[in-house]
Amino acid sequence: MDLYLDTADRGPALALLATGAFRGVTTNPVILQRAGLTVADAPAVHDWAVEGGAERVFLQSWGSTADEVAERGRRLAALSDRVVVKVTATLAGSTACARLASEGVPTLLTGAFTPAHAVLSAGVGASWVAPYVSRIAPDEATAVDVVVAMHRALGAGPTAVLAASLRSLDAVGALAAAGVPAATLGVPLAEALFTHELTLAADGTFEEAAAAAP
């Protein structure tokens, strides 16, 4: 499973990218807003993410019509070949996604909640589809099952699931075990990968033994 960082907060993102565990960052207008930014800051986020080692930077287009979404998507894609343009799974967004995909722009259909959305994403040529795991169902196990069904619906085709809005590392592990190829983690969840209590206890034991060596 490829892991991404669901943040536009520069400091934590760069620190986590430096671990080598994450392929890039995913953003949307809300994530930008939470970092004190706006959609106008997307190019700057792209620049520092790429400088920090991101192989892919997911930037979201927006608009009330397919023309608006597609045109803004083209501008985002022009930043570099590492950009993946995100669009929502609305009529306008899906239409724009199909246009961008036909032009060779890597795309992700976001705001997905059902296996039918996975079918839609493949139909419009999206490279990825992003289900919001925590919003699919109150029960995490049920939500994971739905995302696995989305993954299976796509089969071996060119569209892949990138699971988003995850609340636990258990869900990440379950999705990875089922073959889901990618997930994006918020900063607290990403940091939790490195702070399991048993891992920290083992590390402390190793450090004590090393310090006791003559």
What does each of the following model-derived ranges do?
Residues 1-56, 62-70, 200:
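Conserved N-terminal beta1-alpha1 strand-loop-helix module at the mouth
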Residues 4-6, 34, 58-65, 82-91, ...:
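Catalytic beta/alpha-barrel core
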Residues 11-19, 68-72, 96, 114-124, ...:
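Catalytic cores of alpha/beta
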Residues 20-24, 79-82, 96-108, 123-130, ...:
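Glycine-enriched alpha-helix->loop->beta-strand junction motifs that scaffold or abut catalytic
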Residues 24, 29-34, 111, 127-138, ...:
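Glycine-rich phosphate-binding active-site loops on the catalytic face of alpha/beta enzymes
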Residues 28, 85, 121, 175, ...:
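Conserved, mostly hydrophobic/aromatic
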Residues 43-57, 78-80, 94-106, 142-161, ...:
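Alpha-helix-loop-beta-strand connector modules within alpha/beta enzyme cores
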Residues 154-214:
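C-terminal alpha-helical cap/extension of soluble enzyme domains
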